[in-house]
Amino acid sequence: MNFSIKSVIFLAIVALATLVSASTNPKVTNKVYFDIKQGDKDLGRIVLGLYGEVVPKTVENFRALATGEKGYGYKNSKFHRVIKDFMIQGGDFTRGDGTGGKSIYGERFADENFKLRHTGPGILSMANAGRDTNGSQFFITTVTTSWLDGRHVVFGKVIEGMDVVTAIETTKTLPGDRPATPVIIADCGELPVSNNNDAKAEL
């Protein structure tokens, strides 16, 4: 009996440790890139690692919009909202002002889960208009934004190109936090995942 109880306790500890590991150091299952332009200037490339084992539906939506395989997506869309010491927001490829966008599942889809947290700069998370209103809009943090935990679905992190994120974050803005010179995703798509180097996101 004692052996059986010890076995159950051991398995429970292993399961808990696995869950904690998945939520604090999730595996990068997919990578996408954004090539960014502002006016005539190439700002560079942002590479984003996606956590498909934790939030597979959210990741698939973002990945497919990055590749444009559904006939629509992020290419030539804007970062329409930029707030220094907070985040940069994009993904509204239908209206370009933060009121549009759509997912590959329809106009909106439900919050998948809130297992991952907004722990620092470079976190990739879904923008929304309230509970279960995810579409195509997303944001990348430039600081820790723990007050967004449990409200926005985290699904990835910047692997390369935080300097580009910073350049966008610090650009001159107009009323409504809109960049004075439009910041455009000139090209985007998917990259192969290297198990050795891509597991660790850029801090």
Swiss-Prot record:
SUPFAM superfamilies: Cyclophilin-like. The lineage of its organism: Eukaryota, Fungi, Fungi incertae sedis, Chytridiomycota, Chytridiomycota incertae sedis. Residues 1-22 form the signal peptide. One of its GO terms (biological process) is protein folding. It is found in: Endoplasmic reticulum lumen. Keywords: Endoplasmic reticulum, Isomerase, Rotamase, Signal. PANTHER family: PEPTIDYL-PROLYL CIS-TRANS ISOMERASE, PEPTIDYL-PROLYL CIS-TRANS ISOMERASE D-RELATED. Inhibited by cyclosporin A (CsA). A motif (Prevents secretion from ER) lies at residues 200-203. Residues 33-190 form the PPIase cyclophilin-type domain. It is an enzyme of class 5 (isomerase). Its EC number is 5.2.1.8. PPIases accelerate the folding of proteins. It catalyzes the cis-trans isomerization of proline imidic peptide bonds in oligopeptides. It comes from Orpinomyces sp. (strain PC-2). PROSITE patterns: CSA_PPIASE_1, CSA_PPIASE_2. It catalyses: [protein]-peptidylproline (omega=180) = [protein]-peptidylproline (omega=0). This is Peptidyl-prolyl cis-trans isomerase B. Belongs to the cyclophilin-type PPIase family. PPIase B subfamily. The gene is CYPB. Pfam families: Pro_isomerase. Cyclosporin A binds at W147.
